[in-house]
Amino acid sequence: MDYFPMIFSLLFVAFHGAPETVVLGAELSTESEQGGEQPSPSPPWRPRRSKRCSCSSLMDKECVYFCHLDIIWVNTPEHVVPYGLGSPLRSRRSLKNSFPTKAADHRNRCRCASQKDKKCWNFCQAGKGLRLQDTMEKDWNNQKKGKDCSKLGDKCIHQQLVEGRKIRRLEAISNSIKTSFHIAKLKAELYREKKVTHNGTH
């Protein structure tokens, strides 16, 4: 396994923060020379990164692109490496955020920062549908095989009809999810192309 891209990104992040520490050290040395008469300056303000939601897995490229709006991505052969995930200061979480709510399911694709964000809520719930896809395909294969209900009676036939409807409904949901993800990918590619052409003109 090639660890060079990961080491390179860590070194970049480490050296990116180094000039700030040098500046802080210089400020401390000048204060000690002056006798510490002046109050210590407040730490430099850092803009907070807008984070729409938090993904259950950083390997989910679409989720990370959706949730972390301003992260620069570097494509490597194995996976996508984010730059500077640990750099911004995090705000403290309240106790109510530390415990999962009834609506939040650990099987979801991500967890929204705001419960009022309907787009985010729908996106995170879509992950649940993708995970159900494998079980749906298994059920569909079992449905194709079918049980021999001639000996079991009306109850078996009714159960097969209900399962068939459920599987068709799940199949329709998964198809709509696939198309929405395909559209999201196309939009992301168009955005990247516009950004590249815009940068190339300047």
UniProtKB/Swiss-Prot annotation:
Similarity comment text for this entry: Belongs to the endothelin/sarafotoxin family.
Coiled coil: none
GO cellular component, one term: extracellular space
Span list, region Disordered: 28-49
Entry protein name: Endothelin-1
MF annotations from Gene Ontology: endothelin A receptor binding; endothelin B receptor binding; hormone activity
Functional summary from the UniProt entry: Endothelins are endothelium-derived vasoconstrictor peptides. Probable ligand for G-protein coupled receptors EDNRA and EDNRB which activates PTK2B, BCAR1, BCAR3 and, GTPases RAP1 and RHOA cascade in glomerular mesangial cells. Also binds the DEAR/FBXW7-AS1 receptor. Promotes mesenteric arterial wall remodeling via activation of ROCK signaling and subsequent colocalization of NFATC3 with F-actin filaments. NFATC3 then translocates to the nucleus where it subsequently promotes the transcription of the smooth muscle hypertrophy and differentiation marker ACTA2.
Keyword Transmembrane: no
Cystine crosslinks: C53-C67, C55-C63
Proregion residues excised on maturation: 26-50, 74-202
Residue(s) at site: Cleavage: W73, V74
